[in-house]
Amino acid sequence: MAIFREFDVNDHHDRSLEDRRRHRQLVEKSIKDNLADIISEESIIGQSKNKKVKIPIKGIKEYQFIYGDNSSGVGSGDGSQKKGDRIGKAIKDRDGKGNQGAGNQEGEDMYEIEVTIEDVLDYLMEDLELPLMDKKKFSQILSNNSPKKSGYQRKGINPRLAKKRTVVEKLKRQQGTKRALREIHGELESDPKNKLPENTTIKSRFPFKQDDLRYFRVKRKPKLELNAAIICVMDTSGSMDSTRKFLARSFFFVLYRFIKMKYNNVEVKFISHSTSAKVVTENEFFHKVESGGTYISSGLKKALEVIEENYNPAYWNVYTFYVSDGDNWSEDNSLALKCAKDLCKVCNLFSYAEIIPSPYGSSIKHIFQNKITDNNFTVVTIHEKQDLWKSLKKILNKELEER
Protein backbone atom coordinates (compact mmCIF):
# COMPACT_ATOMS: atom_id res chain seq x y z
CA MET A 1 0.00 0.00 0.00
CA ALA A 2 1.26 3.51 -0.79
CA ILE A 3 2.68 5.51 2.13
CA PHE A 4 1.59 9.13 2.38
CA ARG A 5 3.97 11.31 4.35
CA GLU A 6 2.94 14.54 5.98
CA PHE A 7 4.32 17.69 4.32
CA ASP A 8 2.20 20.29 6.08
CA VAL A 9 3.86 20.98 9.44
CA ASN A 10 0.78 22.82 10.67
CA ASP A 11 -1.62 19.95 10.07
CA HIS A 12 -2.64 17.98 13.16
CA HIS A 13 -2.01 14.38 12.15
CA ASP A 14 -2.87 11.48 14.43
CA ARG A 15 0.60 10.08 15.18
CA SER A 16 -0.80 7.38 17.45
CA LEU A 17 -2.60 5.62 14.58
CA GLU A 18 0.29 3.23 13.89
CA ASP A 19 0.71 2.49 17.60
CA ARG A 20 -2.97 1.56 17.89
CA ARG A 21 -2.69 -0.70 14.85
CA ARG A 22 0.33 -2.52 16.30
CA HIS A 23 -1.42 -2.84 19.66
CA ARG A 24 -4.47 -4.40 18.00
CA GLN A 25 -2.24 -6.89 16.16
CA LEU A 26 -0.59 -7.89 19.44
CA VAL A 27 -3.99 -8.32 21.12
CA GLU A 28 -5.26 -10.52 18.26
CA LYS A 29 -2.13 -12.68 18.37
CA SER A 30 -2.30 -13.01 22.14
CA ILE A 31 -5.98 -14.02 22.02
CA LYS A 32 -5.26 -16.72 19.44
CA ASP A 33 -2.23 -18.00 21.40
CA ASN A 34 -4.23 -18.19 24.65
CA LEU A 35 -7.56 -19.15 23.10
CA ALA A 36 -7.82 -22.58 24.71
CA ASP A 37 -7.41 -21.09 28.18
CA ILE A 38 -9.78 -18.18 27.52
CA ILE A 39 -12.80 -20.06 26.17
CA SER A 40 -12.44 -22.89 28.67
CA GLU A 41 -12.09 -20.68 31.73
CA GLU A 42 -14.75 -21.90 34.15
CA SER A 43 -15.43 -18.45 35.61
CA ILE A 44 -16.71 -17.04 32.29
CA ILE A 45 -19.29 -19.76 31.61
CA GLY A 46 -22.76 -18.33 31.95
CA GLN A 47 -21.48 -14.78 32.46
CA SER A 48 -22.56 -11.72 30.50
CA LYS A 49 -20.80 -10.48 27.39
CA ASN A 50 -19.22 -7.67 29.44
CA LYS A 51 -17.35 -10.11 31.70
CA LYS A 52 -13.63 -9.29 31.43
CA VAL A 53 -10.78 -11.75 31.09
CA LYS A 54 -7.05 -11.08 31.35
CA ILE A 55 -4.62 -12.06 28.61
CA PRO A 56 -0.80 -11.67 28.58
CA ILE A 57 0.70 -9.53 25.84
CA LYS A 58 4.34 -8.95 24.91
CA GLY A 59 5.82 -5.49 25.20
CA ILE A 60 7.08 -3.71 22.07
CA LYS A 61 10.85 -3.20 22.13
CA GLU A 62 12.84 -0.75 20.07
CA TYR A 63 15.29 -2.19 17.54
CA GLN A 64 18.84 -2.52 18.86
CA PHE A 65 22.11 -4.26 18.07
CA ILE A 66 22.79 -7.37 20.16
CA TYR A 67 26.38 -8.58 20.24
CA GLY A 68 27.33 -12.23 20.12
CA ASP A 69 29.30 -14.16 22.71
CA ASN A 70 32.48 -14.17 20.55
CA SER A 71 32.71 -17.94 20.72
CA SER A 72 35.45 -19.54 18.65
CA GLY A 73 34.81 -21.95 15.81
CA VAL A 74 33.03 -21.89 12.47
CA GLY A 75 29.52 -23.19 11.87
CA SER A 76 29.21 -25.56 8.94
CA GLY A 77 26.58 -27.82 7.49
CA ASP A 78 26.43 -31.06 5.52
CA GLY A 79 24.38 -29.66 2.63
CA SER A 80 20.97 -30.75 3.91
CA GLN A 81 20.13 -27.43 5.54
CA LYS A 82 17.29 -25.24 4.31
CA LYS A 83 16.74 -21.52 4.31
CA GLY A 84 16.16 -20.29 7.84
CA ASP A 85 18.00 -23.14 9.59
CA ARG A 86 20.59 -22.16 12.18
CA ILE A 87 23.99 -23.75 11.60
CA GLY A 88 26.46 -24.44 14.39
CA LYS A 89 24.07 -23.25 17.10
CA ALA A 90 25.76 -23.28 20.50
CA ILE A 91 24.00 -24.32 23.70
CA LYS A 92 22.86 -21.18 25.46
CA ASP A 93 22.22 -20.47 29.10
CA ARG A 94 18.67 -21.10 30.22
CA ASP A 95 16.15 -18.31 30.65
CA GLY A 96 14.09 -20.06 33.33
CA LYS A 97 11.00 -20.46 31.11
CA GLY A 98 8.67 -23.41 31.55
CA ASN A 99 10.12 -26.49 33.27
CA GLN A 100 13.76 -25.68 32.56
CA GLY A 101 14.52 -24.76 36.16
CA ALA A 102 16.07 -21.53 37.38
CA GLY A 103 17.75 -19.57 34.59
CA ASN A 104 20.29 -16.77 34.32
CA GLN A 105 19.05 -14.93 31.20
CA GLU A 106 16.84 -11.87 30.91
CA GLY A 107 13.19 -12.65 30.16
CA GLU A 108 10.59 -10.94 27.98
CA ASP A 109 8.47 -8.03 29.17
CA MET A 110 4.87 -9.25 29.51
CA TYR A 111 1.80 -7.20 30.34
CA GLU A 112 -1.75 -8.20 31.19
CA ILE A 113 -4.66 -6.44 29.53
CA GLU A 114 -8.37 -6.88 30.10
CA VAL A 115 -10.77 -7.64 27.26
CA THR A 116 -14.45 -8.50 27.39
CA ILE A 117 -15.87 -11.82 26.24
CA GLU A 118 -17.64 -9.98 23.43
CA ASP A 119 -14.31 -8.53 22.22
CA VAL A 120 -12.72 -11.99 22.20
CA LEU A 121 -15.52 -13.43 20.07
CA ASP A 122 -15.48 -10.37 17.81
CA TYR A 123 -11.77 -10.88 17.09
CA LEU A 124 -12.19 -14.57 16.28
CA MET A 125 -15.58 -15.11 14.69
CA GLU A 126 -16.13 -12.29 12.22
CA ASP A 127 -15.78 -14.70 9.26
CA LEU A 128 -18.02 -17.44 10.67
CA GLU A 129 -21.77 -17.85 10.31
CA LEU A 130 -24.52 -20.42 10.56
CA PRO A 131 -24.03 -22.77 7.57
CA LEU A 132 -26.55 -24.02 5.02
CA MET A 133 -29.15 -21.34 5.73
CA ASP A 134 -32.07 -21.34 3.27
CA LYS A 135 -34.74 -18.78 2.48
CA LYS A 136 -37.92 -19.37 4.43
CA LYS A 137 -41.23 -17.57 4.64
CA PHE A 138 -41.71 -14.61 6.98
CA SER A 139 -38.03 -13.67 7.44
CA GLN A 140 -37.57 -11.88 10.76
CA ILE A 141 -33.93 -12.00 11.86
CA LEU A 142 -31.85 -8.83 11.77
CA SER A 143 -28.11 -9.26 11.34
CA ASN A 144 -25.81 -6.50 12.60
CA ASN A 145 -22.87 -7.63 10.50
CA SER A 146 -23.71 -5.90 7.20
CA PRO A 147 -21.52 -2.79 6.70
CA LYS A 148 -22.05 -0.87 3.45
CA LYS A 149 -19.88 1.75 1.75
CA SER A 150 -21.64 5.10 1.59
CA GLY A 151 -19.57 7.82 -0.08
CA TYR A 152 -16.24 9.29 0.97
CA GLN A 153 -14.82 11.34 3.83
CA ARG A 154 -11.59 13.21 4.57
CA LYS A 155 -10.74 11.42 7.81
CA GLY A 156 -10.56 7.70 8.47
CA ILE A 157 -8.38 4.67 9.14
CA ASN A 158 -5.84 3.20 6.72
CA PRO A 159 -7.80 0.01 5.89
CA ARG A 160 -10.62 2.20 4.53
CA LEU A 161 -8.39 4.36 2.35
CA ALA A 162 -10.02 4.90 -1.07
CA LYS A 163 -6.90 4.76 -3.26
CA LYS A 164 -8.51 5.59 -6.61
CA ARG A 165 -10.44 8.50 -5.16
CA THR A 166 -7.27 9.76 -3.46
CA VAL A 167 -5.38 9.70 -6.78
CA VAL A 168 -8.27 11.55 -8.47
CA GLU A 169 -8.14 14.28 -5.81
CA LYS A 170 -4.38 14.62 -6.31
CA LEU A 171 -4.78 14.87 -10.11
CA LYS A 172 -7.47 17.53 -9.70
CA ARG A 173 -5.16 19.57 -7.48
CA GLN A 174 -2.27 18.99 -9.88
CA GLN A 175 -4.25 20.17 -12.91
CA GLY A 176 -5.48 23.22 -11.03
CA THR A 177 -1.92 24.07 -10.06
CA LYS A 178 -0.69 23.69 -13.67
CA ARG A 179 -3.49 25.92 -14.92
CA ALA A 180 -2.57 28.57 -12.38
CA LEU A 181 1.11 28.31 -13.36
CA ARG A 182 0.26 28.74 -17.06
CA GLU A 183 -1.69 31.89 -16.27
CA ILE A 184 1.18 33.25 -14.21
CA HIS A 185 3.66 32.32 -16.97
CA GLY A 186 1.55 34.17 -19.55
CA GLU A 187 1.45 37.28 -17.40
CA LEU A 188 5.20 37.16 -16.95
CA GLU A 189 5.82 36.87 -20.70
CA SER A 190 3.52 39.80 -21.48
CA ASP A 191 5.35 42.05 -19.02
CA PRO A 192 9.18 41.83 -19.33
CA LYS A 193 9.58 43.62 -15.98
CA ASN A 194 8.16 40.60 -14.10
CA LYS A 195 10.57 37.96 -15.42
CA LEU A 196 11.75 35.29 -12.99
CA PRO A 197 15.44 35.23 -11.99
CA GLU A 198 17.71 33.10 -14.16
CA ASN A 199 18.41 30.51 -11.42
CA THR A 200 14.69 29.88 -10.70
CA THR A 201 13.60 26.23 -11.17
CA ILE A 202 10.13 24.72 -11.04
CA LYS A 203 9.93 21.38 -9.21
CA SER A 204 8.38 18.60 -11.30
CA ARG A 205 7.60 16.34 -8.31
CA PHE A 206 4.03 16.67 -7.13
CA PRO A 207 3.60 14.69 -3.88
CA PHE A 208 0.43 13.60 -2.15
CA LYS A 209 -0.82 15.81 0.67
CA GLN A 210 -3.15 15.19 3.57
CA ASP A 211 -5.94 17.10 1.80
CA ASP A 212 -5.86 14.56 -1.06
CA LEU A 213 -6.69 11.58 1.12
CA ARG A 214 -10.19 10.16 0.88
CA TYR A 215 -11.63 7.32 2.96
CA PHE A 216 -14.70 5.18 2.46
CA ARG A 217 -17.61 6.18 4.66
CA VAL A 218 -19.07 2.98 6.12
CA LYS A 219 -22.58 2.66 7.51
CA ARG A 220 -23.95 -0.42 9.20
CA LYS A 221 -27.42 -1.15 7.94
CA PRO A 222 -29.58 -3.78 9.64
CA LYS A 223 -29.90 -6.62 7.13
CA LEU A 224 -32.95 -8.85 7.10
CA GLU A 225 -31.78 -12.40 7.56
CA LEU A 226 -33.65 -15.67 7.76
CA ASN A 227 -35.59 -17.35 10.53
CA ALA A 228 -33.33 -19.56 12.64
CA ALA A 229 -33.84 -21.72 15.72
CA ILE A 230 -30.96 -23.24 17.67
CA ILE A 231 -31.53 -26.42 19.69
CA CYS A 232 -28.75 -27.18 22.22
CA VAL A 233 -28.87 -30.73 23.63
CA MET A 234 -26.41 -31.85 26.33
CA ASP A 235 -25.88 -35.23 27.98
CA THR A 236 -25.82 -34.72 31.77
CA SER A 237 -25.78 -38.38 32.81
CA GLY A 238 -23.45 -39.95 35.35
CA SER A 239 -20.89 -40.99 32.72
CA MET A 240 -20.32 -37.31 31.95
CA ASP A 241 -17.83 -36.55 34.71
CA SER A 242 -16.89 -33.03 35.81
CA THR A 243 -14.22 -32.65 33.10
CA ARG A 244 -16.57 -33.72 30.31
CA LYS A 245 -19.40 -31.52 31.57
CA PHE A 246 -17.01 -28.59 31.82
CA LEU A 247 -15.86 -29.03 28.20
CA ALA A 248 -19.47 -29.48 27.03
CA ARG A 249 -20.59 -26.29 28.78
CA SER A 250 -17.57 -24.41 27.37
CA PHE A 251 -18.50 -25.58 23.86
CA PHE A 252 -22.13 -24.49 24.21
CA PHE A 253 -21.24 -21.22 25.94
CA VAL A 254 -19.01 -20.01 23.09
CA LEU A 255 -21.55 -21.24 20.52
CA TYR A 256 -24.38 -19.45 22.32
CA ARG A 257 -22.42 -16.20 22.64
CA PHE A 258 -21.50 -16.32 18.97
CA ILE A 259 -25.16 -16.68 17.96
CA LYS A 260 -26.32 -13.87 20.26
CA MET A 261 -23.54 -11.59 19.01
CA LYS A 262 -23.96 -12.31 15.31
CA TYR A 263 -27.74 -12.51 14.99
CA ASN A 264 -30.66 -10.67 16.55
CA ASN A 265 -33.89 -12.44 17.50
CA VAL A 266 -32.54 -15.96 16.98
CA GLU A 267 -34.49 -18.36 19.20
CA VAL A 268 -32.46 -20.78 21.32
CA LYS A 269 -33.79 -23.79 23.24
CA PHE A 270 -31.79 -25.73 25.84
CA ILE A 271 -32.35 -29.45 26.50
CA SER A 272 -30.56 -31.61 29.07
CA HIS A 273 -31.01 -35.36 29.40
CA SER A 274 -29.94 -38.50 31.22
CA THR A 275 -32.51 -41.31 30.85
CA SER A 276 -35.19 -38.65 30.33
CA ALA A 277 -34.98 -35.22 28.74
CA LYS A 278 -36.47 -31.83 29.51
CA VAL A 279 -36.30 -28.26 28.27
CA VAL A 280 -34.38 -26.08 30.76
CA THR A 281 -33.48 -22.42 31.14
CA GLU A 282 -30.13 -20.95 30.15
CA ASN A 283 -29.01 -20.72 33.78
CA GLU A 284 -29.99 -24.34 34.52
CA PHE A 285 -28.29 -25.53 31.35
CA PHE A 286 -24.92 -24.00 32.24
CA HIS A 287 -24.94 -24.57 36.00
CA LYS A 288 -27.22 -27.41 37.06
CA VAL A 289 -25.57 -30.79 37.81
CA GLU A 290 -27.39 -34.09 37.24
CA SER A 291 -26.61 -37.81 37.25
CA GLY A 292 -28.17 -41.11 36.20
CA GLY A 293 -28.08 -43.45 33.22
CA THR A 294 -27.96 -42.54 29.55
CA TYR A 295 -30.66 -42.75 26.90
CA ILE A 296 -29.38 -40.64 24.03
CA SER A 297 -32.69 -41.11 22.24
CA SER A 298 -34.47 -39.16 25.01
CA GLY A 299 -32.54 -35.96 24.25
CA LEU A 300 -32.86 -36.28 20.47
CA LYS A 301 -36.56 -37.17 20.73
CA LYS A 302 -37.18 -34.08 22.88
CA ALA A 303 -35.43 -31.96 20.23
CA LEU A 304 -37.79 -33.38 17.59
CA GLU A 305 -40.78 -32.56 19.80
CA VAL A 306 -39.60 -28.96 20.28
CA ILE A 307 -39.12 -28.54 16.53
CA GLU A 308 -42.54 -30.03 15.75
CA GLU A 309 -44.32 -27.82 18.29
CA ASN A 310 -42.52 -24.52 17.69
CA TYR A 311 -40.39 -24.48 14.53
CA ASN A 312 -41.98 -25.67 11.32
CA PRO A 313 -39.10 -26.48 8.91
CA ALA A 314 -41.06 -24.77 6.13
CA TYR A 315 -40.66 -21.45 7.95
CA TRP A 316 -37.55 -21.91 10.08
CA ASN A 317 -33.88 -22.75 9.61
CA VAL A 318 -33.29 -25.25 12.42
CA TYR A 319 -29.86 -26.12 13.85
CA THR A 320 -29.42 -28.86 16.43
CA PHE A 321 -26.17 -29.28 18.36
CA TYR A 322 -25.73 -32.35 20.56
CA VAL A 323 -22.83 -33.00 22.96
CA SER A 324 -22.18 -36.29 24.77
CA ASP A 325 -19.37 -38.65 25.73
CA GLY A 326 -20.84 -41.26 23.36
CA ASP A 327 -21.60 -43.76 26.12
CA ASN A 328 -25.18 -45.04 25.69
CA TRP A 329 -27.35 -47.90 26.95
CA SER A 330 -26.86 -50.51 24.22
CA GLU A 331 -30.58 -51.26 23.84
CA ASP A 332 -31.18 -47.58 23.07
CA ASN A 333 -28.72 -47.31 20.15
CA SER A 334 -31.22 -48.21 17.41
CA LEU A 335 -33.77 -45.66 18.64
CA ALA A 336 -31.05 -43.01 19.02
CA LEU A 337 -29.95 -43.64 15.43
CA LYS A 338 -33.54 -43.29 14.18
CA CYS A 339 -33.97 -39.99 16.03
CA ALA A 340 -30.66 -38.71 14.62
CA LYS A 341 -31.77 -39.53 11.07
CA ASP A 342 -35.11 -37.79 11.69
CA LEU A 343 -33.26 -34.69 12.90
CA CYS A 344 -31.22 -34.63 9.69
CA LYS A 345 -34.50 -34.53 7.74
CA VAL A 346 -35.92 -31.49 9.54
CA CYS A 347 -32.72 -29.55 10.35
CA ASN A 348 -30.44 -27.48 8.18
CA LEU A 349 -27.60 -28.86 10.29
CA PHE A 350 -27.37 -31.60 12.90
CA SER A 351 -24.00 -31.59 14.63
CA TYR A 352 -22.69 -34.10 17.15
CA ALA A 353 -19.68 -33.29 19.35
CA GLU A 354 -18.22 -36.19 21.31
CA ILE A 355 -16.39 -35.23 24.51
CA ILE A 356 -13.47 -37.49 25.59
CA PRO A 357 -14.93 -40.78 24.25
CA SER A 358 -15.27 -43.50 26.86
CA PRO A 359 -12.62 -46.27 26.61
CA TYR A 360 -15.23 -48.87 27.54
CA GLY A 361 -17.63 -50.19 24.92
CA SER A 362 -18.44 -48.75 21.52
CA SER A 363 -19.16 -45.07 21.04
CA ILE A 364 -22.38 -43.81 19.45
CA LYS A 365 -20.17 -41.72 17.16
CA HIS A 366 -19.13 -44.78 15.14
CA ILE A 367 -22.77 -45.82 14.70
CA PHE A 368 -23.74 -42.32 13.53
CA GLN A 369 -20.79 -42.07 11.14
CA ASN A 370 -21.45 -45.49 9.56
CA LYS A 371 -25.23 -45.20 9.30
CA ILE A 372 -25.93 -41.51 8.62
CA THR A 373 -25.00 -40.32 5.12
CA ASP A 374 -26.81 -36.96 5.06
CA ASN A 375 -24.65 -34.01 3.99
CA ASN A 376 -26.07 -31.82 6.77
CA PHE A 377 -24.68 -34.09 9.50
CA THR A 378 -21.27 -33.34 10.97
CA VAL A 379 -19.22 -34.97 13.75
CA VAL A 380 -16.38 -33.53 15.82
CA THR A 381 -14.37 -35.04 18.68
CA ILE A 382 -13.11 -32.99 21.63
CA HIS A 383 -10.33 -34.64 23.64
CA GLU A 384 -9.10 -31.55 25.50
CA LYS A 385 -9.81 -27.85 25.80
CA GLN A 386 -7.42 -27.06 22.93
CA ASP A 387 -9.86 -28.85 20.59
CA LEU A 388 -12.81 -26.56 21.38
CA TRP A 389 -11.91 -23.81 18.92
CA LYS A 390 -11.05 -26.21 16.07
CA SER A 391 -14.36 -28.01 16.56
CA LEU A 392 -16.37 -24.79 16.55
CA LYS A 393 -14.63 -23.58 13.40
CA LYS A 394 -15.38 -26.84 11.63
CA ILE A 395 -19.06 -26.64 12.54
CA LEU A 396 -19.52 -22.93 11.82
CA ASN A 397 -17.75 -22.79 8.48
CA LYS A 398 -19.87 -21.21 5.77
CA GLU A 399 -19.89 -24.44 3.81
CA LEU A 400 -19.53 -27.88 5.31
CA GLU A 401 -16.54 -29.88 4.15
CA GLU A 402 -17.32 -32.86 2.01
CA ARG A 403 -17.54 -36.02 4.02
Swiss-Prot record:
NCBIfam families reported for this sequence: spore_yhbH
Compositional bias per record (Basic and acidic residues), positions renumbered to this chain: 80-97
PANTHER family found in the cross-reference section: UPF0229 PROTEIN YEAH
Top-level taxon: Bacteria
Annotated spans, Disordered: 71-109
UniProt xrefs under InterPro entries: Spore_YhbH (IPR014230), UPF0229 (IPR006698), vWFA_dom_sf (IPR036465)
Protein name per Swiss-Prot or TrEMBL: UPF0229 protein CKL_0641
Similarity-based family: Belongs to the UPF0229 family.
Pfam families assigned to the protein according to its UniProt record, in alphabetical order: DUF444
